Regions:
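Short, intrinsically disordered, charge-balanced linker/junction segments flanking boundaries
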Residues: 1, 193-202
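Zymogen propeptides
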Residues: 1-147
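Active-site-adjacent helix-turn-beta-strand microarchitecture at beta-sheet edges
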Residues: 126-195
Length: 202
């Protein structure tokens, strides 16, 4: 069934240009995590809840938080986990003013501050990473290599389009030209769904 066409001599207004609707993104939800130990578990453990301080967009929270008690007995030992929706936000790395120590990276690459252009959209900031002398774990930002990469080291790679990949260096090295930044740590605690062989788990 179609609408009738206009007579040949009729004046038909040009249709307004249509703007395609933006693709619908999935709601940001995560499956609850079973508490590791019933004896030390507390109410709400493993249940993901929005983080109000981070805010929301498109009616969806930008971050979710849960708490777990990993000790079999002690209830005062807790781990707080925050997950960000990377389809609605992005991860940026800013080099410290002194770390990672490097003799090759330009001082212009290491101001140790969040750039002013990012202040209005900043959701959260955290400080982390090993000092260069503690393992010589690699780091690179915008083409400037502060410390060369180490084989076997867990690498957080930020792609030029803004994606994030976490994997051992040997799985990322082939695509390093596509990365805007990367930072390394000791071996990944979890990779491909499996804990590292040195991690104790019950």
């Amino acid at each position: 069934v179609a609408a009738p066409t206009a007579p040949p001599n009729a004046t038909t207004p040009a249709p307004a240009p249509s703007t395609p609707a933006p693709p619908q993104r999935s709601p940001f939800t995560l499956p609850n995590v079973p508490p590791p130990h019933a004896r030390s578990a507390q109410p709400g453990d493993g249940e993901w809840k929005p983080v109000p301080e981070v805010g929301e967009t498109e009616g969806q929270p930008l971050a979710l938080l849960t708490t777990l008690h990993p000790h079999p007995i002690r209830k005062d030992v807790e781990v707080v986990v925050i997950a960000f929706d990377l389809t609605r936000s992005e991860l940026l790395w800013v080099a410290g003013a002194k770390e990672p120590e490097s003799k090759t990276a330009s001082p212009e690459k290491r101001k140790g501050m969040v750039p002013a252009r990012d202040h209005d959209r900043l959701l959260a900031a955290f400080n982390g990473g090993f000092m260069a002398k503690h393992g010589r774990y690699g780091a690179m930002l915008d083409g400037a290599e502060f410390v060369p990469p180490r084989e076997g080291a867990c690498t957080v790679g930020i792609t030029k389009p803004g994606g994030v990949r976490v994997a051992p260096w040997e799985e990322i090295a082939a695509a390093k030209a596509e990365l805007a930044a990367w930072r390394q740590t000791p071996p990944c605690l979890l990779h491909d769904g499996q804990p590292h062989q040195s991690v104790r788990h019950d």
